[in-house]
C-alpha cells in the first residue's frame, strides 16, 4: 500500500495545476487565506474524486437512483483510501432528529429501558408486578386462605353502551354472574344497561372457598379468567369487600392499572407505540398566537384588525361578523380593544348559537338563513388541507410553537415515563447534559439487581464509550434531547466526528472542515486528542484549519496561497510545522510574530448610552442582567454551551427585531429591557451564502449591477437601439442568450455518466445575445465587466461615484480578487460574510445601528481576521455598535467591552462572570477566557 496520496494537475476552481504529495495515516492540516483554494483542494478535489470512485463501484442500475458525480478537474490522484467528509453544514432539518438519535445513544438507551427498567404505578407510585399463572395461584392461596372469593375478568372498562349482545353471549357460554358498576348481579335474559352512561363490567368466572385442596379448581378458573380478561384478572373478597388485581402483564397490585411489557419501540418518539399522541412525538404543539392574529388592537374589524381576514370587503364573512356584533355589542368600526372578553372570544373561536344572516346580497336565492360562525381560528385551520407551501406559510405566520401540554416536551406517551432505571425515566435521562449523563451512568449499576446488571452490562458499555467520545470533542454541555436543528455547524461536525471515532474504522481518509468552530480555547486540546485517536487507529486525517494549536499538533501542513482568488491556488509551503515557520508565507509571518494583530493603545469611550436586559432566563441563563454599552465593539465570550447564543441570538436579537420591525420572532424569557430607543436599525451579518442560485454574485448582491446596467442604458449604442437597463440583465428575456438562458453553459445529460457542462454554442459562454454584446462602455461590453475583478472594476469606474463607492467597499474588506460575476455558491462562508459587510459599509447610516455577528472568524485566516477587524472598527468609529459572539483571542483582545458567560457549559453555565475591558476579564480568576487573555500579557 502506498504511503502517500499523490495529486497531479489539480485545476478545480482557482487551483493552478497543483501537484502535491500528502502522507497517509497522518494528521494533515491545510491552511491559507479565505478563498485561497483550501476547500477546493480538500473537498472539491480529494473528497470529490474519492466519492466518484465509490459511485463507480455501483451498478448502472443503482447509479440511476443515487445519481452520479462530476469528475473533478485533476489529471490523476493515487493512494486514495475510502473518503469520509465531515463538514460544517447542518443538513438535518428533521424535527425528530436529536443528539441522541444522531449519535445512536438513543437506540442503546431504549434497549436499556426495555430490558432493565422497573415500572411504577402512575396512580399509587408503587412498583408494578409481573406474575406467571403459578405465582398468581400461590399468592391467592397464601393471601386469601380460608376466605370466600370471586375470580373475575374485566370485560368492559369505563365505556358507554347497553351491552345486550355481550350479556347474551356470556349467558350462552354458561356464565351466571357479572359485577356491573361495582355490584354483583345475575345475568338475565334480555338484560341491558343505560346506553348513555359509562359502565365497568367484570365477569364472575368462579366463586370458591380458598384452600390448598382447591388448587386444581383455582388454576382452571384462573386460566379462564386470564383468557376472558386478556391477561388480567381480579380477586374479590366477599368478607372484606376488597379486591386485588393480577396480570400476566405489568400491573399495579392495588389499582389494577396494567401496562404491556416494554419493548424498545415503547421508548421511541418516532414510533406510534411510544410517541405522545398529542404532538406525535415532536415535543411541541402549534397554538394560535393572539398577538399575530390581532397585531394592533386599536384598529377596527373594518380597518383590518384581524390580520387573517384583512380589511373590510362586502362578503358573507363580514356580514356574519356584523350579525355577531349585534349579539355581543360591537360594530365593525369599534376598535378591537373595546370588545368584551366574550365578544373577542366569539370572533376568534366561534359561537355556539347560529346567526341569522340576510343572503340577498350574496346569493340569487337570497332570503334569511341560519349560519354558524366558526371563528377566525377555524378559518385559519382550514388551510391544513392546503398542502401547498404558500398555504402552509400563510397559516404558520399566525402560529407559535410551545412545549406540548400533554407530554411536557418529553415526546413520549405517559406510560413510557413510568419505567425507571435507577430512579430516572428515559425523558429525565435525555434531558441531562452529556457530562451529567456520564456521571449518572457511571453509578447506575450500583442500583441494579444482579439480574438487571447482567442484562445491562454490554448496553452500558456501548453508551459510556459514545459519551466519552462526545465529551472528548467538547460537547459535554449538550443533552441527548437537544434538537439537531438547533445545533451550530461546528457542533454538528463534532457530533459526526465523535460518531466516526466510535465506528472504529481503519484505513479511511477523513476530511474535516474547521472542527474547532464554536470551540473555546480551553477545549481545543481535547479535540486535537480525538483527531490523533482517529489517526492512531490507522486512518488518514486531513483538516482544513487556521487554529495555531491544531497546526502545532499536525504531522504535515499544506499552506495554500499566496493570496485569495486568482492570486491564490498554489502550494506556497508544505511540510512540518518547523518547515512552515521557515517559509515566507503569510501564515508563517503570523506564526512567527513577524505580523500580528496589535492590541489597541486605547479603547473607545462609547456614547454613554446602553441597552440593558434584566432577568434573562432562557435555556441555561440564570436570570442574568446584561448591559450592552453603545458605540463600542462588544465581544460576548465563554466556553461552548455557556449561554452566549441564548443571550444574544435568542434574547437580545428577537427583542430588537420586535421593537424595530414588528417581527414575529419570540425572545426567550426575560423581565425587562431598556435603552432600545437609542438605536434605529438592527443588522445581523452571518456567513450564509449571498444567494441560493449560481446567478447571484457580488455585483447583484451589492446592487452595483443595477447601477452598471443603468450606465450601459445611457451609452450612445443603447440609446440608438432603444435598449433599457433590463436588456443588460442575464436573468430576464430580452438581452440574455435564450439558448443557455443567461447561464453561459449548457447541460448535457449523460444518463449513467455525470452531466457534462459545455460552453454555450450560441453565445460562446458570454451569457448575452450578439446585439447586447455590441453595446460598449469605454470599449468593454457587459460580459467583459462581469469578468473583471473588483480591483480592475474600481479603476475602470473611478469616475462613476455611485458604482465606485460600492466597489471600493468590497475592495476594502479584502475581496478585490473576486470577479463581479463570480457565482455566489462558489464563495466561502468568510467571503459571503464580508460581501454583506461591504454592502453595509457602502450605505449611509445614522450612527445608531446595532450589528450582530455570530463567530465571524469562522473559516478566516489570521490575515482575513485583520481585514475583518478593520471593517468592524470602521463601523464602530461611525458611532455604531458591533456585538460579536467569538472564541478567537485575536478578536477578543481588541474589543472595547467583553461580556464573559460561564463558568462551564450547560447547567453549570448561564452566569455573567465578568463584564468590562479585556484587562478586567483577564483579572477574573473564574473566567477561562480571562486565563487565556492573561497568558497573552493583558
Segment roles from a protein language model:
Residues 1-938:
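Conserved phosphate-binding elements of NTP-dependent enzyme cores
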Amino acid at each position: 500500500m502506498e504511503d502517500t496520496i499523490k495529486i497531479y494537475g489539480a485545476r478545480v476552481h482557482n487551483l493552478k495545476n497543483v501537484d502535491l504529495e500528502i502522507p497517509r495515516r497522518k494528521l494533515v492540516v491545510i491552511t491559507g487565506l479565505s478563498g485561497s483554494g483550501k476547500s477546493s483542494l480538500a473537498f472539491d478535489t480529494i473528497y470529490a474524486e474519492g466519492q466518484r470512485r465509490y459511485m463507480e463501484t455501483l451498478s448502472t442500475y443503482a447509479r440511476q437512483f443515487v445519481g452520479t458525480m462530476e469528475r473533478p478537474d485533476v489529471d490523476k490522484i493515487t493512494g486514495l483510501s475510502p473518503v469520509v467528509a465531515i463538514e460544517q453544514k447542518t443538513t438535518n432539518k428533521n424535527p425528530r432528529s436529536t443528539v441522541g438519535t444522531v449519535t445512536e445513544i438513543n437506540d442503546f438507551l431504549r434497549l436499556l429501558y426495555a430490558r432493565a427498567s422497573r415500572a411504577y404505578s402512575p396512580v399509587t407510585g408503587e412498583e408494578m408486578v409481573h406474575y406467571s399463572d403459578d405465582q398468581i395461584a400461590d399468592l391467592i392461596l397464601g393471601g386469601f386462605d380460608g376466605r370466600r372469593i370471586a375470580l373475575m375478568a374485566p370485560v368492559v372498562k369505563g365505556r358507554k353502551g347497553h351491552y345486550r349482545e355481550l350479556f347474551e353471549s356470556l349467558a350462552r357460554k354458561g356464565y351466571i354472574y357479572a359485577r356491573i358498576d361495582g355490584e354483583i348481579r345475575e345475568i338475565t335474559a334480555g338484560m341491558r344497561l343505560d346506553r348513555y352512561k359509562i359502565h365497568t363490567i367484570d365477569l364472575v368466572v368462579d366463586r370458591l372457598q380458598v384452600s390448598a385442596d382447591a388448587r386444581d379448581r383455582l388454576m382452571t378458573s384462573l386460566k379462564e379468567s386470564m383468557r376472558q380478561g386478556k391477561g388480567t384478572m381480579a380477586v374479590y373478597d366477599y368478607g372484606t369487600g376488597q379486591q386485588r388485581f393480577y396480570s400476566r402483564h405489568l400491573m399495579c397490585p392495588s389499582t389494577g392499572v396494567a401496562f404491556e411489557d416494554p419493548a424498545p419501540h415503547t421508548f421511541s418518539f418516532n414510533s406510534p407505540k411510544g410517541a405522545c399522541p398529542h404532538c406525535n412525538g415532536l415535543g411541541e404543539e402549534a397554538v394560535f398566537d393572539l398577538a399575530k392574529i390581532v397585531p394592533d388592537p386599536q384598529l377596527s374589524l373594518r380597518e383590518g384588525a384581524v390580520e387573517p381576514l384583512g380589511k373590510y370587503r362586502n362578503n358573507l364573512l363580514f356580514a356574519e361578523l356584523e350579525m355577531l356584533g349585534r349579539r355581543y355589542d360591537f360594530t365593525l368600526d369599534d376598535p378591537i380593544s373595546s370588545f368584551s372578553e366574550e365578544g373577542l372570544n366569539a370572533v376568534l373561536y366561534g359561537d355556539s348559537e347560529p346567526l341569522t344572516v340576510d343572503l340577498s346580497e350574496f346569493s340569487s336565492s337570497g332570503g334569511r338563513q341560519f349560519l354558524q360562525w366558526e371563528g377566525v381560528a377555524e378559518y385559519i385551520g382550514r388551510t391544513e388541507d392546503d398542502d401547498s407551501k404558500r398555504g402552509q406559510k400563510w397559516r404558520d405566520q399566525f402560529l407559535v410553537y410551545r412545549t406540548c401540554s400533554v407530554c411536557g416536551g418529553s415526546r413520549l406517551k405517559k406510560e413510557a415515563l413510568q419505567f425507571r432505571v435507577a430512579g430516572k425515566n428515559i425523558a429525565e435521562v435525555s434531558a441531562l447534559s452529556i457530562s451529567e449523563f456520564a456521571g449518572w451512568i457511571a453509578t447506575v449499576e450500583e442500583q441494579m439487581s444482579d439480574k438487571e446488571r447482567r442484562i445491562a452490562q454490554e448496553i452500558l458499555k456501548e453508551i459510556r464509550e459514545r459519551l466519552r467520545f462526545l465529551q472528548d470533542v467538547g460537547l459535554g454541555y449538550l443533552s441527548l434531547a437537544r434538537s439537531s436543528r438547533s445545533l451550530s455547524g461546528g457542533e454538528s461536525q463534532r457530533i459526526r466526528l465523535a460518531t466516526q471515532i466510535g465506528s472504529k474504522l481503519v484505513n479511511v481518509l477523513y476530511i474535516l472542515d474547521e472542527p474547532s468552530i464554536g470551540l473555546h480555547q480551553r477545549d481545543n486540546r481535547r479535540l486535537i486528542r480525538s483527531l490523533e485517536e482517529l489517526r492512531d487507529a490507522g486512518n488518514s486525517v486531513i483538516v482544513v484549519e487556521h487554529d495555531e494549536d491544531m497546526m502545532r499538533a499536525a504531522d504535515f501542513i499544506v499552506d495554500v496561497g499566496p493570496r485569495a482568488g486568482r492570486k491564490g491556488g498554489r502550494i506556497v509551503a508544505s511540510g512540518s510545522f518547523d518547515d512552515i515557520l521557515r517559509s515566507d508565507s503569510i501564515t508563517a509571518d503570523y506564526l512567527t510574530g513577524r505580523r500580528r494583530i496589535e492590541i489597541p493603545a486605547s479603547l473607545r469611550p462609547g456614547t454613554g448610552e446602553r441597552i440593558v436586559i434584566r432577568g434573562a432566563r432562557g435555556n441555561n441563563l440564570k436570570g442574568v442582567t446584561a448591559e450592552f454599552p453603545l458605540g463600542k465593539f462588544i465581544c460576548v465570550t465563554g466556553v461552548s454551551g455557556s449561554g452566549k447564543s441564548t443571550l444574544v441570538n435568542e434574547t437580545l436579537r428577537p427583542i430588537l427585531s420586535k421593537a424595530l420591525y414588528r417581527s414575529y420572532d419570540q425572545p426567550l424569557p426575560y423581565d425587562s429591557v431598556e435603552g432600545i430607543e437609542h438605536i434605529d436599525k438592527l443588522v445581523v451579518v452571518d456567513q450564509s451564502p449571498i444567494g441560493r442560485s449560481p446567478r447571484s454574485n457580488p455585483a447583484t448582491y451589492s446592487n452595483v449591477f443595477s447601477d452598471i446596467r443603468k450606465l450601459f442604458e445611457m451609452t450612445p449604442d443603447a440609446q440608438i437601439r432603444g435598449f433599457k437597463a433590463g436588456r443588460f440583465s442575464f436573468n430576464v428575456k430580452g438581452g440574455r442568450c435564450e439558448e443557455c438562458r443567461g447561464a453561459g453553459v449548457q447541460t448535457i445529460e449523460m444518463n449513467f455518466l455525470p452531466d457534462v457542462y459545455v460552453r454555450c454554442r450560441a453565445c460562446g459562454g458570454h451569457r448575452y445575445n450578439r446585439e447586447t454584446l455590441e453595446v460598449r462602455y469605454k470599449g468593454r461590453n457587459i460580459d467583459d465587466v462581469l469578468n473583471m475583478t473588483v480591483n480592475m472594476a474600481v479603476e475602470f469606474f473611478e469616475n462613476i461615484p455611485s458604482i465606485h463607492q460600492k466597489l471600493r467597499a468590497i475592495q476594502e474588506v479584502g475581496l478585490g480578487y473576486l470577479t463581479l460575476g463570480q457565482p455566489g455558491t462558489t464563495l466561502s462562508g468568510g467571503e459571503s460574510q464580508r460581501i454583506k459587510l461591504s454592502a453595509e459599509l457602502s450605505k449611509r447610516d445614522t450612527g445608531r445601528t446595532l450589528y450582530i455577528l455570530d463567530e465571524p472568524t469562522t473559516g478566516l485566516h489570521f490575515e482575513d481576521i485583520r481585514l475583518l477587524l478593520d471593517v468592524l472598527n470602521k463601523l464602530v468609529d461611525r458611532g455604531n455598535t458591533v456585538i460579536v459572539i467569538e472564541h478567537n483571542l485575536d478578536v477578543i483582545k481588541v474589543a472595547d467591552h467583553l461580556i464573559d458567560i460561564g463558568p462551564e457549559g450547560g447547567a453549570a453555565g448561564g452566569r455573567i462572570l465578568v463584564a468590562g475591558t479585556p484587562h478586567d476579564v483577564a483579572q477574573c480568576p473564574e473566567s477561562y477566557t480571562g486565563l487565556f487573555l492573561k497568558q497573552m500579557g493583558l
